[in-house]
UniProtKB/Swiss-Prot annotation:
One MF term in the entry's GO annotations: toxin activity
This protein's UniProt keywords: Disulfide bond, Ion channel impairing toxin, Secreted, Signal, Toxin
Signal sequence range: 1-18
Compartments where located: Secreted
Name recorded for this polypeptide: U12-hexatoxin-Hi1a
Aminoacyl-tRNA synthetase among keywords: no
Length: 110
């Protein structure tokens, strides 16, 4: 009778202990699947943000793709204002010529 009682207690303990291991494995599997789902959601959010940022950059580049930076005029080039001339050149009429158009010339000294 004692032997049967011992086996009964051992079988009950084994069954309850085995169930806890299975429950723990199920919890770990659920947690890992949840963490994978969270990672996938985070990845999708990051991809959406990246697409939005790079999309804006591409739109700006598309808008300005035909725009070319204005070049400055060198010495002796015709100009309309000082901003048209490179560096420290002045946009002024050359008194030594009969042409009325201003040119990029060296600044007056003094």
């Amino acid at each position: 009778m004692r032997v049967a009682l011992v086996f009964l207690v051992l079988s009950i303990l084994a069954a309850t202990h085995g169930d806890t291991n299975l429950d723990m494995e199920r919890k770990e599997a659920d947690e890992s699947s949840l963490s994978e789902m969270k990672e996938m959601l985070l990845l999708q959010e990051l991809q959406a943000v990246e697409a939005a940022l790079f999309g804006k950059m591409n739109v700006e580049n598309d808008e300005n793709r035909d725009f070319r930076e204005k070049r400055c005029g060198g010495y002796g080039m015709s100009c309309k204002s000082v901003q048209d001339c490179c560096g420290e050149l002045d946009c002024r009429k050359d008194p030594s010529t009969w042409i009325d158009h201003p040119y990029c010339l060296n600044p007056k000294k003094g």
